[in-house]
Amino acid sequence: MRGKIVVITGASSGIGQVAAEKLAGMGARLVLVARDKARGEAALARLREIAPAASHTIHYGDLSRLAEMKRVASEIAAAEPCIDVLINNAGALFGFRQVTEDGLELTFATNHISYFVLTQGLLKSLQAAAPSRVISTSSDAHKGLKLDFNDLQSANKYRGFPVYGRSKLANILFTSELARRLAGSGVTANCLHPGFVATRFGDQSGGFFSYVVRAAKVFAISPEKGAETIVYLASSDEVANVSGKYFYKCRQATPTRQAQDDEAAKRLWSETAKLAAVGMD
């Protein structure tokens, strides 16, 4: 990874922070994306301790807001004409339905649309660095669920964990369609389930649901363990030519039938482009 440029979201805590530190230790230069400035500066300082010779940087933005997604992508693209690895790493879960200033359901905007918009905005830099990689953090929470294209915004019925699970299903379908569109370009796209990890995940979900999530963390794995598959997909030669796949514990895994629906993947792409008001050739 020496000299490689890695962009990673969700990098100021949890598995994103651990993955960034591991990759910095392997010689990569990290470009962090974070919302909280205090945690972001702490994460950046830690990277500079690990690899003081590398010019690690950070960009701040709220990736639930379309304008912020696009601004951050534009700023990074201008600063980084070549990007070797993009790691989309979002996993917010909310107990109550919330709507962003763009009229988007908050979970779907943060966990899925931000992946789409950031990848769109950084694609030229990824293509310029080919062979390069797009890695998206998904989850086994997608199991047993399917997308309702008549209600992608969960307006009719909202339950926190299924809404989260559908956003993670969207990550897998996004990865599949991205891989199809980028075939032969030198840019690969894969996604992963990190496991149930003891991080800040779910702390902001609200009410009784937040209590349940915190209580369940007694059974969770460490962020270090959860970050292993991210680091593997970013760095291993074993997956250099693998694209469109789902991984768990550094191995290919099989997602549900609903997550392997090519027509659903194409339709989700189209619907997401409309919601995000962007296109992708």
Where does each model-flagged region fall?
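A short small-residue
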Residues: 20-24, 210, 251-255
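A short, mixed-charge helix-start or loop-turn motif at secondary-structure junctions
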Residues: 9, 156, 160, 212-216, ...
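Short acidic-hydrophobic sequence patches enriched in Asp/Glu that either
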Residues: 39, 207-208, 218, 264
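A glycine/serine/threonine-rich, flexible loop-to-helix segment
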Residues: 198-214
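C-terminal helical subdomain
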Residues: 167, 191, 214-254, 260-266, ...
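Rossmann-fold NAD(P)H-dependent dehydrogenase/reductase core
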Residues: 1-200, 275-281
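Short glycine/threonine-rich loop-to-helix capping motif typified by GTGT followed
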Residues: 203, 258-259
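Short, flexible, mixed-charge acidic loops at enzyme active sites
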Residues: 147-152, 204-207, 246-247
